[in-house]
UniProtKB/Swiss-Prot annotation:
<dbReference type="GO" id="GO:0044780">
    <property type="term" value="P:bacterial-type flagellum assembly"/>
</dbReference>
<dbReference type="InterPro" id="IPR003775">
    <property type="entry name" value="Flagellar_assembly_factor_FliW"/>
</dbReference>
<comment type="similarity">
    <text>Belongs to the FliW family.</text>
</comment>
<comment type="subunit">
    <text>Interacts with translational regulator CsrA and flagellin(s).</text>
</comment>
<keyword id="KW-0963">Cytoplasm</keyword>
<dbReference type="GO" id="GO:0005737">
    <property type="term" value="C:cytoplasm"/>
</dbReference>
<dbReference type="InterPro" id="IPR024046">
    <property type="entry name" value="Flagellar_assmbl_FliW_dom_sf"/>
</dbReference>
<dbReference type="Pfam" id="PF02623">
    <property type="entry name" value="FliW"/>
</dbReference>
<protein>
    <recommendedName>
        <fullName>Flagellar assembly factor FliW</fullName>
    </recommendedName>
</protein>
<dbReference type="GO" id="GO:0006417">
    <property type="term" value="P:regulation of translation"/>
</dbReference>
<comment type="function">
    <text>Acts as an anti-CsrA protein, binds CsrA and prevents it from repressing translation of its target genes, one of which is flagellin. Binds to flagellin and participates in the assembly of the flagellum.</text>
</comment>
<keyword id="KW-0143">Chaperone</keyword>
<keyword id="KW-0810">Translation regulation</keyword>
<keyword id="KW-1005">Bacterial flagellum biogenesis</keyword>
Length: 148
């Protein structure tokens, strides 16, 4: 699918990289279809969620397990059913990233991960019922903890 974007120009997104949120993303509930744009550098854990219907809307995302090795949560039966998940291997998890001017404050939202069923491309942003994670988990702080 050819998609016009503000950030990347006109790009071709493969059908298998188009995902659909039945309820949208928090704050953008009216936007349902996004393309996953993977970083050309295959070693990078970062990707983009580009709205198909709105050229200027794109979210930086990251595989949270790459940054926070002990990230763990249980997906509620409601979401397992809504996304038609039968096996954990069907799932990709992304955390939306905020990139401020001060790059030392780059953060990811671990409180509300994006869950994607790779097989049927259904997606949902799930707000976890826990105080263990926040919407601003600082990536640089996490990486420094791992170096110690």
């Amino acid at each position: 699918m050819l998609v016009k974007t503000t950030h990347f120009g006109e790009i071709n997104i493969k059908d298998e990289d188009i995902i659909e949120f039945s309820e949208g993303i928090v704050g953008f509930e009216d936007i349902h279809r996004y393309g996953i744009i993977r970083n050309q550098n295959s070693d990078s854990p970062f990707s983009w969620l580009q709205a198909v219907e709105k050229s200027e809307l794109a979210f930086a995302v990251v595989d949270p397990f790459v940054i926070k090795k002990d990230y763990d949560f249980v997906l509620s039966d409601e979401y397992v059913k809504a996304l038609d998940i039968n096996d954990p291997s069907q799932v990709n998890v992304y955390a939306i990233v905020v990139v401020p001017d001060d790059l030392t404050k780059i953060s990811m939202n671990l409180k509300a991960p994006v869950i994607v069923n790779k097989d049927n491309r259904k997606a949902a942003q799930v707000i976890l019922d826990t105080d263990e994670y926040t919407v601003r988990h600082y990536i640089m702080d996490e990486l420094q903890k791992q170096e110690v």
